[in-house]
Regions:
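Short glycine-rich phosphate-binding loop at a beta-alpha junction
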Residues: 61-74, 108, 263-276, 351
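N-terminal phosphate-binding loop and adjacent alpha-helix
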Residues: 37-62
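Short, Lys/Arg-enriched N-terminal segments with co-localized hydrophobic residues
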Residues: 1-5
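Flexible beta->alpha loop and helix N-cap segments adjacent to enzyme active/binding sites
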Residues: 8, 12-44, 79-82, 86-92, ...
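Short, hydrophobic/amphipathic alpha-helical packing segments
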Residues: 50-54, 115, 173, 244-252
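Active-site cores of enzymes that catalyze phosphoryl transfer or operate on phosphate-rich substrates
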Residues: 190, 198-242
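Phosphate/ATP-binding catalytic cores across multiple sugar-kinase/actin-like superfamilies
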Residues: 238-267
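Secondary-structure capping and boundary motifs in well-ordered enzyme cores
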Residues: 228, 232-236, 240, 244, ...
């Protein structure tokens, strides 16, 4: 192949949060570009691609290969088994049919959903040797998988399959409190801090058959109806959050059991955590504090959108040159530091759109609403402008060298620049 560049297009669509990525595998796995469809369509968590995102992807072409993040025939088999006959039998629900309208006429390789998740984490991680845990609502069939990563190769060790799913359980309670399942779980996580976990044991008794291996008593894909109709939604949120943390703690311990005894290869206990459930930063902090692992890597986009990168890495079995999540559309110009400071001093708030867009669900400074945290009014001001609930959390931004003066991070977490973990404030500090 000589010096010819080999560029691969990775695609995730036809599920929540469609995305595309371009990777140059001849240049050390450089991620040239990666973006969410929603950034172009303005439809939150858009399931489908659009002409605008495809056009931008094509500026990085031509492509030597197109890779898709899951296996649609397996997925349709599960949909048929679950009674979703309309989805299972509709040929328009096949990804290639969707892609053809944008001039993409072939998919060269299909990588399984959970392998894409696992590869997203492993091949962007700083580890050669680790255990990889993937937890989400559902892939084709898998809902939980454990892999051993060693010297650039992944080996599947254990899997749990549909309908037994921690992600589906959490989504069922998202729906129960009036939120949108498979989209607004992050709001449920925020609600949990305002309630008490008084229903945790009841949820476990009524819905869970066993914690390890994880088994549900019923298929909860369609929700739990109006279970406990008089319960305070905040208490329901707190209860399912606390139970989820317990279930994940069991899984982290189970994953750790696959690590070999300490050796030259496995000198430290390293975890890669992926899948949509890995976005639960409150749970991540509790779990990190248990000290099960020495080092933890959660790729900043561990959900389905990130698998547009992971499917390529899995296909090539190659580490990627991961530097940061600023991989999307570029708004050129010097970052307006002085203008931001002036705006914050005068009006307490400032919107920023500069540089390359974040690839992932968190606003990390390039597409962000910034606010001065001092004073009692700013919380309500931000919530009003964003049209969101009063209980929603905020992400502090601080110089890395000052973090430990103001915040207490979980055990084994040195910093958290991408919102994978939460931190406790150190009391008595003057802001």
């Amino acid at each position: 192949m000589g010096n010819k560049k080999m560029r691969i297009l990775g695609i995730n669509c036809m599920n929540h949060d469609a995305a595309m990525a371009v990777i140059d595998v001849q240049e050390g796995g450089d991620i040239l570009w990666a973006a969410h469809a929603e950034r172009y369509s303005k439809v939150k968590n858009d399931h489908f691609l659009n002409q605008q995102i495809v056009d931008e992807a094509m500026t990085y072409g031509p492509f030597d290969k197109v890779v898709y993040y899951e296996k649609p025939i397996l997925k349709k088999t599960r949909q048929f088994w679950a009674g979703q006959y309309g989805l299972a039998l509709d040929p328009k629900e096949m990804p290639l049919q969707h892609l053809k309208q944008f001039g993409i006429n072939k998919i060269d390789e299909y990588v399984s959903h959970h392998e894409s998740h696992a590869a997203t984490g492993y091949y962007t991680s700083p580890f050669n040797d680790c255990v990889i845990l993937t937890v989400d609502a559902i892939g084709e069939w898998d809902t939980i998988s454990i892999w051993l990563g060693s010297q650039g190769k992944m080996e599947l060790k254990e899997r749990i399959q549909y309908p037994h799913s921690i992600g589906v359980l959490y989504s069922a309670f998202t729906k129960r409190v009036g939120l949108k399942p498979a989209e607004e779980e992050y709001i449920l996580m925020g609600m949990a801090a305002y309630g008490q976990p008084i229903y945790k044991d009841k949820i476990q008794r009524e819905f869970i058959q066993s914690s390890m291996p994880f088994r549900l008593k019923h298929n909860l894909h369609r929700g739990i109806g109006n279970w406990m109709p008089d319960a305070d939604p905040m208490d329901l949120a707190s209860s399912i959050q606390a139970l989820t943390e317990e279930l994940l703690a069991n899984l982290w311990s189970r994953a750790a059991s696959y690590l070999p005894a300490k050796s030259l290869l496995f000198a430290e206990r390293n975890l890669v955590f992926g899948g949509g459930v890995a976005l639960n930063c409150a749970a991540n902090s509790k779990l990190a504090g248990l000290g099960i692992f020495d080092n933890i890597w959660i790729m900043p986009n561990p959900g389905d959108a990130g698998s547009s990168i992971g499917c390529v890495a899995a296909s090539e079995k190659q580490y990627l040159n991961w530097q940061h999540p600023f991989l999307g559309h570029n708004i050129e110009g010097e970052y307006p530091v002085d203008s931001i400071i002036n705006e914050l001093e005068q009006n307490m708030m400032c919107g920023v759109a500069n540089g390359r867009a974040e690839f992932g669900p968190r606003a990390l400074g390039n597409r962000s609403l910034l606010a001065d945290p001092r004073g009692p009014k700013v919380k309500d001001m931000v919530n009003q402008i964003k049209r969101r609930q009063k209980f929603r959390p905020f992400a502090p931004a601080i110089l890395e060298e000052d973090v430990h003066d103001y915040f207490r991070l979980p055990k084994h977490v040195k910093n958290t620049p991408y919102m994978q973990f939460t931190a406790a404030c150190v009391r008595g500090k003057d802001f």
